[in-house]
Amino acid sequence: MSKEFLPTILKQKEQEVAAMSYEELQPLRSTYSLYEYLKNHPQELQLIAEVKKASPSLGDINLGVDIVEQARTYERCGAAMISVLTDEIFFKGHLDYLREISSQVTIPTLNKDFIIDEKQIVRARNAGATVILLIVAALSEKRLQELYDFATGLGLEVLVETHNLAELETAHRIGAQIIGVNNRNLVTFETDINTSLQLSAHFKDDRVYVSESAIFSKEDAELVAPYFHAVLVGTALMQAENVAEKIKELKIDKG
């Protein structure tokens, strides 16, 4: 993986946004609040299950997957939310995947993309997302705050992704309620689950936290379970021979 991954993908996003038209706002899909759900179900490590056909680090993961059936399995097996990759070039996703999945499930859906503009947020909402991703490393704090306020003003929830203490403090400052800790470094693309463990010492009681990336096994989930409300898992589920069994393995009872 090139060490220029993040700048490369952001440059591509700037080109996409420049060519993107403004969409008329459509009604917000009705479902429960992810924040409230995670807050109210602390006895079990919750799962945000991802639909991801490919990634820059692994290449093709599961190109032949029936995305709607995969999402239905996630919901049936107790996922708290479904994350849907919509980036076409780097992850072989599509906005239509978000639209199709959101129309077939009742739980929250996350638009997993590199969002840098309000136009993308409106498109996500119109496609059925109730949660969007904002990545601290991809935005200035001023722009992050603007996009966060814009999204929440439209009734969306926001998963604010961090990777180090400075980014975590930024997420706290802008008022983020749902905060992700990505165990993957978006510059080197290497993963280290210790990132989650180290940052957990700085968590606040009134927020909810999600550990993202590098969660493949029950042992991985057990490591982060004492500190996090949920884990976001993509590759392990997309590669699993038995998705239901893998979900059962990852949903840790926290007593």
Curated annotation (Swiss-Prot):
Gene3D superfamilies: Aldolase class I (3.20.20.70). The keyword Lyase applies. GO terms for biological process: L-tryptophan biosynthetic process. SUPFAM superfamilies: Ribulose-phoshate binding barrel. It comes from the Bacteria. Its EC number is 4.1.1.48. It catalyses: 1-(2-carboxyphenylamino)-1-deoxy-D-ribulose 5-phosphate + H(+) = (1S,2R)-1-C-(indol-3-yl)glycerol 3-phosphate + CO2 + H2O. One of its GO terms (molecular function) is indole-3-glycerol-phosphate synthase activity. Pathway: Amino-acid biosynthesis; L-tryptophan biosynthesis; L-tryptophan from chorismate: step 4/5. HAMAP family: IGPS_B. This is Indole-3-glycerol phosphate synthase. The gene is trpC.
